[in-house]
Regions:
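N-terminal glycine-rich flavin-associated loop
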Residues: 93-112, 138
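Conserved small/polar residues in nucleotide/adenosyl-binding loops
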Residues: 156-163
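A short, Trp-centered hydrophobic/proline-enriched beta-strand micro-motif
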Residues: 124-132
């Protein structure tokens, strides 16, 4: 048995033992787990599933183990996703922190920032969001506008020279 076949067998066995039955059903809108300090779990098995996946590092399988991720390579992640799909498992955590913030902290944060924030994000203990605010538009990104002025071989967009 190859390493990947062995990994698939281990994942399948772990999921069979640890994924609660109600987490193998289609997602119910009010049961989506966003995490955070004041998270409410309408389905108690959602919290169990989050805790188990968080302990395993599989809420963010590609992130390094030392920060609470799974430390998996791309082939292992494909297998994990395939096995999750096979049993119809719901995502344990929907988190902008995982998708948007954790990769930035991994890339640009210092060690203290990584250790402080990433494990809490991956376990759903804290919740992050991203806000946009633009002059004349506020947070309505659909109303953004810009203009450009042809300067010969250069093209300047509005406010670009001020940066």
């Amino acid at each position: 048995m190859s390493n990947l076949e062995n990994f698939r067998a281990q994942v399948s066995e772990w999921l069979e033992e640890n994924c609660p039955p109600s987490m193998r059903t289609p997602m119910v809108e009010d049961e989506v787990v966003w995490g955070g300090r004041n998270a409410v779990y309408k389905n108690p098995e959602s919290k169990i599933w989050l805790d188990k996946m968080g302990e395993k590092g599989w809420t963010a399988p590609a992130l390094p183990k030392e920060y609470g991720g799974g430390g998996l390579n791309s082939d292992e992640i494909k297998i994990l996703n395939s096995e999750l799909f096979k049993i119809g498992a719901r995502p344990a955590l929907n988190s902008f922190g995982i998708w948007m913030l954790a990769p930035v902290i991994i890339e640009y944060g210092n060690e203290a920032q990584k250790m402080e924030h990433i494990p809490k994000i991956l376990k759903g203990e804290i919740r992050w969001c991203q806000g946009y605010s633009e002059p004349g538009s506020g947070s309505d990104l659909a109303s953004l506008s810009t203009k450009a002025e042809d300067m010969g071989c250069l093209l300047y967009t509005s406010d670009a020279a001020d940066e």
